[in-house]
């Protein structure tokens, strides 16, 4: 699975453990092999929202089910990468209002390792592949640091 270039959307594709994990999480959902011929950039295409696309979106809007699914996969990938790096399973829980605001938490043992308030979820996306990778890696690194600071709670 190589990351391919998709210059029209998202700029140059970057090599990232987070993007590789996100692709793996999404491909795991494909039980019938419909996405086997798609490149990784095609799989992740909907995570890219250009500045022009974001400007055309309404200020207030309801998120559609596909967008909520993508957001869930984003946080699932974070949880799995945290588990790979620490050995502690990190599961997500989210509460989302139909108008696009809510909260997501990742919990390892008895420890909250990620806590993020969400708003304007209908605009969820990243301008470039690099920003998508950076956002995921930043949350993973923060969660790993929290687990390393409180290992007893994370392993409880």
From Swiss-Prot:
Pfam families: DUF269. The keyword rRNA-binding does not apply. The keyword Plastid does not apply. One of its GO terms (biological process) is nitrogen fixation. It comes from the Bacteria. Gene3D superfamilies: Protein of unknown function DUF269. Keywords: Nitrogen fixation. Belongs to the UPF0460 family. This is UPF0460 protein in nifX 3'region. It comes from Rhodobacter capsulatus. The lineage of its organism: Bacteria, Pseudomonadati, Pseudomonadota, Alphaproteobacteria, Rhodobacterales.
């Amino acid at each position: 699975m190589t990351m391919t270039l998709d210059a029209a959307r998202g700029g140059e594709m970057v090599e990232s453990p987070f993007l590789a994990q996100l692709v793996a999480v999404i491909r795991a959902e494909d039980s019938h092999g419909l996405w086997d011929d798609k490149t990784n950039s095609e799989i992740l295409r909907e995570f890219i929202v250009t500045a022009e696309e974001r400007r055309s979106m309404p200020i207030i809007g309801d998120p559609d089910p596909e967008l909520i699914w993508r957001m869930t996969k984003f946080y699932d990938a974070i949880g799995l990468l945290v588990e790979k790096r620490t050995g502690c399973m990190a599961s997500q829980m989210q509460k989302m209002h139909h108008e696009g605001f809510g909260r997501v938490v990742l919990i390892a043992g008895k420890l909250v390792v990620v806590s993020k308030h969400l708003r304007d979820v209908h605009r969820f996306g990243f301008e470039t592949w690099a920003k998508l990778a950076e956002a995921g890696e930043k949350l993973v690194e923060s969660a790993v640091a929290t687990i390393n600071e409180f290992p007893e709670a994370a392993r409880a």
